[in-house]
């Protein structure tokens, strides 16, 4: 993990375009940006909430996996896949609690960080920050709700189809964010195993739903994929 003091133009742009600080006056943005430093996590850097609860992060680029793990079995469950303009850890920020959560960079991840107490000070100083933070928390809760519904009512092929649809660029018919993930990482997103996901991917390929090559996947029959997503 590398740290850089202060922020450059990219860092300022990240702050000014983030949902939390967008439309703030320029002098306020400059003051806020001056309190952030840039961090670089090389691929597969891991950390946990205990180590990071004193800092608030905003992602500039790359993907960060937020997950829990069963120490006895080694199985993982991925709660969120954070990307550009996402931020963490919201729970530690608003409640100060230490929850059991882990983070792993899936590739090099660049982010900005500031002290949690500084962020809390801004929440008191700028009330609209609270509204925007609540909106973000609401969206995260909806993701967890969607997972609970999918896990309860849908079989694994349908869950897999829904994950693909959620990450599909409908213009290019190509996947974004999860396109180059291993089958094990994809399994962690839907509560399954690598072997089961691999089997269903091969079924999707045989049925003419997907075109699969090395670390690339393309939807070639959207109607069939939509049908799969409904347990049919």
Predicted regions and their residues:
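Cyclic nucleotide-binding regulatory module and flanking cytosolic helices
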Residues: 1-42, 87, 92-94
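Polybasic "coupling" helices that flank or enter modular domains
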Residues: 124, 128-191
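Phosphate-/nucleic-acid-contacting segments
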Residues: 167-232
């Amino acid at each position: 993990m590398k740290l850089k003091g202060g922020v450059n133009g990219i860092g300022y742009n990240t702050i000014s375009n983030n949902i939390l600080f967008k439309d703030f006056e320029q002098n306020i943005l400059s003051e806020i940006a001056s309190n952030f430093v840039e961090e670089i996590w090389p691929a597969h850097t891991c950390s946990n909430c205990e180590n990071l609860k004193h800092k608030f992060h905003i992602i500039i680029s790359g993907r960060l996996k937020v997950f829990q793990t069963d120490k006895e079995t080694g199985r993982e469950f991925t709660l969120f896949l954070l990307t550009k303009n996402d931020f963490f850890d919201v729970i530690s920020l608003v409640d100060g609690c230490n929850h059991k959560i882990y983070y792993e960079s899936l590739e090099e991840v660049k982010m900005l960080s500031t002290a949690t107490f500084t962020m809390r000070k801004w929440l008191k100083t700028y009330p609209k920050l609270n509204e925007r933070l609540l909106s973000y928390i609401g969206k995260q809760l909806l993701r967890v709700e969607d997972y609970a519904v999918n896990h309860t009512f849908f079989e694994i092929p349908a869950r897999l189809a829904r994950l693909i649809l959620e990450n599909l660029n409908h213009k290019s018919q190509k996947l974004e964010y999860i396109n180059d993930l291993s089958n094990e990482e994809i399994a962690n997103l839907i509560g399954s195993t690598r072997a089961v996901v691999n089997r269903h991917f091969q079924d999707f390929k045989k049925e003419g739903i997907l075109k699969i090559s090395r670390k690339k996947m393309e939807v070639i029959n959207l109607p069939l994929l939509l049908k799969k997503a409904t347990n049919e």
